[in-house]
Design a protein with these regions (language model features):
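Mature catalytic domains of secreted/periplasmic carbohydrate-active enzymes
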Residues: 2-59, 66-479
């Protein structure tokens, strides 16, 4: 490699699959362009600015293009330039889920959703062999973010489209579950705080967790299913898994809490999904900034990507075979670094491993609150929407982050996902039972799935105020 290029991030182009150029690997070259904070994986513009991606082409190829972006209150004019080739297009604000949101009462508590989308670019780029630069110029009067530029090789386009059609054919339908009612998302982890006093050590908390009481509580709240976190913010898993212990020694428990939850919930007709945090499961940094703070050598190390996916598959297969058909689904968090760091999508392998023991197990890969989904290999949208917003259209998202995917939205009812404060009560519900029930009924009518995230204390109990709202919601939804 040329010495002048050794400090750049240079993405090798693929010719039998898509290549993703994340905003993170672009070099900012002028104006109001930056990488910042929780959005470190994208390019952030607060006015006109420019950047450049560097790619390595093994041969000349023509690529179709898609740009994943967010536009604030004004459209942006985007120009892509490669040598003498120029592609110009205006990208307007996206009209998706967030355009009809009921904002959080306290925006500082967490991020309100924003509408981002992956949109086809009107023209192509022909990239000659060698190290090449794709220049990006953004003209905007407001805020504009570029998450990634997607390159689809013309020579393999038909095969890529057939693979995406296969992924769609393999999806189990969520319609029956959506028609039954809503679910609960419960962030109970090694970080969840008690109402009073100090936390129990993790394994003690697992042993003390009352699965029967938890299941009764879920039933009283009207849940048809529960998404239960296992390792959010932690490498611990609440069961004696051999593969997990292999990669995270000592981070398992003697008690099999998911098995006990399945038994208690099943008696009440409630299904169990498991949440898994991919960064901690895979053993790479969990926060976006650190996950994307990589070298050119690391970015090009697809062998490392394969090794990580192999570990994930091994753990998923053990979990899936252990719980079989009684484990209804997965919600796999923070998947975007696996695609956007390496520029290639390994999701198919992991998706198929997630079906071990239950070919109908519903599986979703989360790309964060503000990044368009870039894999066809999932059964339902992760739906990290947080607030009430646009209803589904024929069971799918009509626009925005998850456009075209089976509709699933998660509402954060009280605390910011989990209860993280000592000697403090869980926050009051931000939505009334009327607001919740109207939205849930609207989604059920249109084939969409809704999950309500309610914080719990370390003993697994919700706040009395949250329980009151959910009991009334249950009464109105199922009347």
């Amino acid at each position: 490699m040329d010495q002048n290029n050794e400090n750049k991030k240079i993405m090798p182009l693929r010719y039998n699959e898509k290549t993703w150029l994340s905003g993170r690997i672009a070099e900012t070259t002028g104006g109001f362009a930056s990488h910042r904070g929780a959005q470190a994986y994208c390019l952030h513009f607060r006015g006109d600015g420019s950047a450049v991606w560097t790619v390595e082409a093994a041969r000349q190829e023509t690529f179709d293009l898609k740009l994943a972006y967010f536009a604030g209150k004004a459209a942006a004019r985007v120009t892509l330039r490669l040598g003498s080739q120029t592609v110009c297009q205006v990208f307007p604000p996206v009209n998706g889920y967030a355009s009809q949101q009921i904002p959080m009462r306290d925006p500082a508590m967490m991020q309100n959703p924003e509408d981002c989308e992956s949109v086809e670019v009107v023209d192509t780029l022909t990239i000659p062999e060698g190290i090449r630069e794709i220049h990006l110029q953004v003209e905007t009067r407001g805020e504009f973010r570029v998450f990634y530029l997607e390159l689809i090789p013309r020579s393999a386009k038909a095969a890529i489209e057939e693979k995406e059609a296969e992924a769609a054919r393999l999806r189990p339908s969520i319609f029956a579950l959506a028609q039954k009612g809503y679910g609960l998302f419960i962030h109970w982890t090694a970080r969840t705080k008690p109402r009073y006093g100090e936390m129990l050590p993790y394994e003690e908390a697992v042993n003390a967790f009352d699965a029967e009481r938890f299941a009764r509580q879920a039933e009283e709240m009207g849940a048809q299913y529960v998404i239960f976190t296992t390792n959010h913010g932690s490498e611990a898993f609440p069961a004696p898994l051999t593969a997990w212990n292999k990669y995270h020694p000592g981070k398992i428990t003697a008690r099999d809490l998911p098995a006990d939850l399945i038994t208690a919930l099943e008696k009440r007709g409630i299904q169990l999904f498991l949440y898994l945090h991919i960064p901690h499961m895979a053993g790479f940094p969990s926060d976006y900034g650190t996950s994307f703070n990589f070298t050119n050598t690391a970015m090009r190390d697809t062998a490392a990507q394969s090794e990580i996916c192999g570990r994930i598959c091994e753990m998923l297969e053990e979990i899936g075979l252990r719980y079989g058909e009684k484990l209804a689904g997965y919600w796999l968090d923070c998947w975007q670094p696996m695609v956007l760091k390496y520029g290639t999508d390994p999701t198919e392998q992991v998706y198929k491993a997630a079906k071990a023991g239950n070919s109908r197990r519903l599986t979703s890969f989360a790309f964060g609150v503000r990044c368009p989904t870039c894999t066809p290999w999932q059964d339902y949208a992760c739906g990290e929407t947080r607030v009430i917003g646009m209803l589904p259209k024929e069971g799918r998202y009509a626009g925005g982050q998850s456009k075209g995917y089976p509709y699933h939205s998660i509402l954060v009812l009280d605390d910011d996902w989990w209860h993280d404060f000592y000697d403090n009560p869980i926050a009051d519900p931000q939505y009334s039972a009327d607001q919740l029930s109207d939205y849930i009924r609207g989604c059920m009518k249109n084939g969409g799935l809704v999950t309500v995230n309610t914080a719990v204390y370390q003993d697994g109990t919700v706040s009395p105020k949250t329980m009151d709202v959910m009991k009334l919601t249950k009464k109105r939804v199922y009347a």
